[in-house]
Amino acid sequence: MAAAVAAAPGALGSLHAGGARLVAACSAWLCPGLRLPGSLAGRRAGPAIWAQGWVPAAGGPAPKRGYSSEMKTEDELRVRHLEEENRGIVVLGINRAYGKNSLSKNLIKMLSKAVDALKSDKKVRTIIIRSEVPGIFCAGADLKERAKMSSSEVGPFVSKIRAVINDIANLPVPTIAAIDGLALGGGLELALACDIRVAASSAKMGLVETKLAIIPGGGGTQRLPRAIGMSLAKELIFSARVLDGKEAKAVGLISHVLEQNQEGDAAYRKALDLAREFLPQGPVAMRVAKLAINQGMEVDLVTGLAIEEACYAQTIPTKDRLEGLLAFKEKRPPRYKGE
């Protein structure tokens, strides 16, 4: 089968070396021995949060993004491993209230550290990214911090942001962005890196970088077209338009839209419900399904089917597959161990 996969057609363009190494490592961890078509070796695993008073999309200006990088930096990212019936679900809670959860150097460092730990933890089944600050998911870059950077510092820092967002996109388990508030610029790019996005109807989302005479630098120019189509993505980026939750659902940017509740966490609760739906499924199957979808979306159908075949082969020798068959025969819930 490996020979058949290697022979599958579908030439691809070159990819940034760092991204290629990242995906190669991810693929090796998910599917040891998996051989993708030669032109796909190291291919990027493609993808594929509420605020009141913000101006809606119809002709209105983008919300202002004034915030500070001052005050304390500890506890800006809270990593919670849920227990009991939610065991296996990890929640990354962004908690930088004084900076509207903007992407500072410290927050990027903390995100990178958390993602590095999670990607190799086989007890993790699903990851939810949310805000612990009412009304905000992530307001994008910390502009006050950015204003203090020299021109020579900006590029490398944006590259760090892009790398962390790519790491999130390449996590081996399902990821869900719970958008209960404002998600602008890098905040929306962070959400776009997740497998599934859910939002409150009052949430505001947009790639507004062109208002600052720059472009999205955290993957937005690539992931937004893949999510909603090229023409509409161009329109939204060119206009710096901001969408509310219902508008985002209508264009396919998010999967679910909820009316906000009194607690302000409607999207998070929906994300938690989805994560609970994922928990009973076979862990190995979930990982290789994500890999097959992500890799297959980047290539032609014939090559994608070869990728699916190679990924399916990884599930055949697993103990979980045998457990699934036995549980079906015995008419009981399966007890999967990720083996």
UniProtKB/Swiss-Prot annotation:
Keywords per UniProt: Acetylation, Branched-chain amino acid catabolism, Disease variant, Lyase, Mitochondrion, RNA-binding, Transit peptide
Molecular function GO labels: enoyl-CoA hydratase activity; itaconyl-CoA hydratase activity; methylglutaconyl-CoA hydratase activity; mRNA 3'-UTR binding
Presequence extent in this chain: 1-67
Modified residues annotated as N6-acetyllysine in this record: K100, K113, K144, K204, K211
Catalyzed reactions: (3S)-3-hydroxy-3-methylglutaryl-CoA = 3-methyl-(2E)-glutaconyl-CoA + H2O; (3S)-citramalyl-CoA = itaconyl-CoA + H2O; 3-hydroxyisovaleryl-CoA = 3-methylbut-2-enoyl-CoA + H2O; (S)-3-hydroxyglutaryl-CoA = (2E)-glutaconyl-CoA + H2O
Top EC class of this enzyme: lyase
Classification via Pfam families: ECH_1
Compartments it resides in: Mitochondrion
InterPro entries: ClpP/crotonase-like_dom_sf, Enoyl-CoA_hyd/isom_CS, Enoyl-CoA_hydra/iso, Enoyl-CoA_hydra_C
Gene Ontology annotations of biological process type: fatty acid beta-oxidation; L-leucine catabolic process
Main location: mitochondrion
Chain residue ranges for the region called RNA-binding: 105-119
Keyword Transferase: no
Effect after changing K105N: Abolishes RNA-binding
Domain of life from the UniProt record: Eukaryota
GO CC aspect terms: mitochondrial matrix; mitochondrion
Listed pathway(s): Amino-acid degradation; L-leucine degradation; (S)-3-hydroxy-3-methylglutaryl-CoA from 3-isovaleryl-CoA: step 3/3
Family matches, as Gene3D superfamilies: 2-enoyl-CoA Hydratase, Chain A, domain 1 (3.90.226.10), Lyase 2-enoyl-coa Hydratase, Chain A, domain 2 (1.10.12.10)
E.C. designation(s): 4.2.1.18, 4.2.1.56
Disease: 3-methylglutaconic aciduria 1: An inborn error of leucine metabolism. It leads to an autosomal recessive syndrome with variable clinical phenotype, ranging from delayed speech development to severe psychomotor retardation, coma, failure to thrive, metabolic acidosis and dystonia.
Family according to the record: Belongs to the enoyl-CoA hydratase/isomerase family.
Subunit structure: Homohexamer.
Function: Catalyzes the fifth step in the leucine degradation pathway, the reversible hydration of 3-methylglutaconyl-CoA (3-MG-CoA) to 3-hydroxy-3-methylglutaryl-CoA (HMG-CoA). Can catalyze the reverse reaction but at a much lower rate in vitro. HMG-CoA is then quickly degraded by another enzyme (such as HMG-CoA lyase) to give acetyl-CoA and acetoacetate.
Protein name in UniProt: Methylglutaconyl-CoA hydratase, mitochondrial
